[in-house]
């Protein structure tokens, strides 16, 4: 499974692509889309949209993972970040990719083992898990961490979704209150 991870931002949007076979991970590509701050908001969003479309076209991922926007103390910043995230979602939808979303806490827990990990810890674990020669840039590391999180957690979620669908169709096994019942 090839996973495209995205760390959305209006100034800098990180992307990272990995291949995952079971628990084995392989680095494919990563980078940061730097958006010129002098551009008007619509043009800034278009830069994100166009660049992520190009990344998806070139790397041909099977699925995408995106970090969920956190609530900031500054509502205006949260709205702007949400718009950058919207541009990323449009690029992924345009590329016909299934999108899975994870909180920063979920991503850090999946990659480092604790949801309270510092950025440097995430960078170090991404470097180790993907056997990279150097430490990835912060935005790229966050995007790669998002992809790694999906590689570890996504298949389990898919199985649970299928079990839930089977329960709705009346076959066994079934889920009740989030628990498997037989």
Curated annotation (Swiss-Prot):
Name the GO terms of the biological process aspect.
Answer: DNA recombination; DNA repair
Q: Where is the signal peptide?
A: none
EC number, UniProt record: 3.1.21.10
Keyword terms of this UniProt record: Cytoplasm, DNA damage, DNA recombination, DNA repair, DNA-binding, Endonuclease, Hydrolase, Magnesium, Metal-binding, Nuclease
| Naturally occurring in which organism (per UniProt) | Bordetella bronchiseptica (strain ATCC BAA-588 / NCTC 13252 / RB50) (Alcaligenes bronchisepticus)
CDD domains per UniProt = RuvC (cd16962)
Q: Which of this chain's residues are annotated to bind Mg(2+) 1?
A: 7, 139
Chain coiled-coil ranges: none
Q: What function does this protein fulfil? A: The RuvA-RuvB-RuvC complex processes Holliday junction (HJ) DNA during genetic recombination and DNA repair. Endonuclease that resolves HJ intermediates. Cleaves cruciform DNA by making single-stranded nicks across the HJ at symmetrical positions within the homologous arms, yielding a 5'-phosphate and a 3'-hydroxyl group; requires a central core of homology in the junction. The consensus cleavage sequence is 5'-(A/T)TT(C/G)-3'. Cleavage occurs on the 3'-side of the TT dinucleotide at the point of strand exchange.
* Catalysed transformations (reactions): Endonucleolytic cleavage at a junction such as a reciprocal single-stranded crossover between two homologous DNA duplexes (Holliday junction)
NCBIfam families in the record: ruvC
Descriptive protein name: Crossover junction endodeoxyribonuclease RuvC
């Amino acid at each position: 499974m090839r996973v495209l991870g995205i760390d959305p931002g209006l100034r800098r949007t990180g992307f990272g692509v990995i291949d995952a076979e079971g628990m084995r991970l392989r680095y494919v590509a990563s980078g940061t889309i730097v958006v010129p701050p002098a551009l008007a908001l619509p043009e800034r969003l278009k830069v994100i949209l166009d660049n992520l479309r190009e990344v998806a076209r070139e790397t041909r991922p099977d699925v995408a993972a995106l970090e969920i926007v956190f609530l900031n103390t500054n509502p205006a910043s949260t709205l702007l970040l949400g718009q950058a995230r919207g541009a990323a979602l449009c690029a992924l939808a345009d590329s016909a990719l299934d999108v899975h979303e994870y909180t920063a806490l979920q991503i850090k827990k999946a990659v480092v083992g604790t949801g309270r990990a510092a950025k440097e810890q995430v960078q170090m674990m991404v470097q180790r898990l993907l056997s990279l020669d150097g430490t990835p840039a912060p935005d790229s590391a966050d995007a790669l961490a998002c992809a790694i999180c999906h590689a570890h957690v996504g298949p389990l979620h898919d199985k649970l979704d299928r079990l839930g669908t089977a329960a709705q169709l009346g076959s066994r096994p079934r889920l009740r209150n989030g628990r498997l019942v037989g």
